[in-house]
Amino acid sequence: MSDPFIGPDEAPASALEQLLISRRAFVAGTAASAFVLWTPQVKAAVELEGVQIEETITAYGKKLVLNGIGLRKRGYFKADVTALYLPERRTTAEAVMKLDGLRRIQLNILREFTSSTISRIFIADFKQVATDDEFKRLIDVIGQIGAAYANVKRVTKGDVVNLDWVPGRGWMATHNGKQLTGDQAEDPMAINNELAYQIYLRMYIGPHAPAELRNGLLGLTRMNRVGGGTVNPEP
């Protein structure tokens, strides 16, 4: 009996042809699945002044979330895009200070600074936000931080400086991945003083910090996502 769906000039596929067609379909399907599985996942990021900041990172084996970003200025100049990473998002300076665990201030440099300029700015800002008693108590620590900055001859646009508080290890600073501070108690470059780091945080989220920068780092302003969309302020 003839097949009504086969034209007069067509012949039914042989068993071998059907097998080959099935194999081709299987290989094509497998390749498509593999492509989906191995396609690299693009990390979510926000953008400010052309700088892309990842919304989640891993540092010292711990996951951190982006709390906020802000533009830091020096006079009329744009100095850096600052990012604050925390274990959990917080919207007040007091809550950030009380938070246990790893914290990171990340500076994405927008213009060139020499090490002497960086040290001078740091000391002036630190003295402004610390009490007289705190400044006197931490004078040796301030000297250590100044020595760490001296290891960086200059920073230029595109450089990344991370300033971390790591429980049990202390204040860890890196410039483009190069470590500037020590993490052993006997190391003269080790800075294991949490008060000093909290005072450093005040420079960015304390009452003396510019309101625009402070609100941005505390997640109180909208952040623009790379590729479209926004990260809205915390309620």
Regions inferred by a protein language model and the residue ranges of each:
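N-terminal secretory signal peptides
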Residues: 1-21, 30-36, 45-97
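Soluble periplasmic/extracytoplasmic beta-strand elements of cell-envelope proteins
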Residues: 65, 83-85, 104-108, 172
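Mid-length scaffold segments of soluble, non-membrane domains
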Residues: 90, 95-162, 166
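Short strand-turn-strand beta-turns centered on an Asx-Gly dipeptide
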Residues: 175-177
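Flexible glycine-rich active-site/ligand-binding loops centered on an Asp-His dyad
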Residues: 183-211
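Cysteine/selenocysteine-centered motifs that mediate thiol-based redox chemistry or coordinate metal-sulfur cofactors
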Residues: 212-235
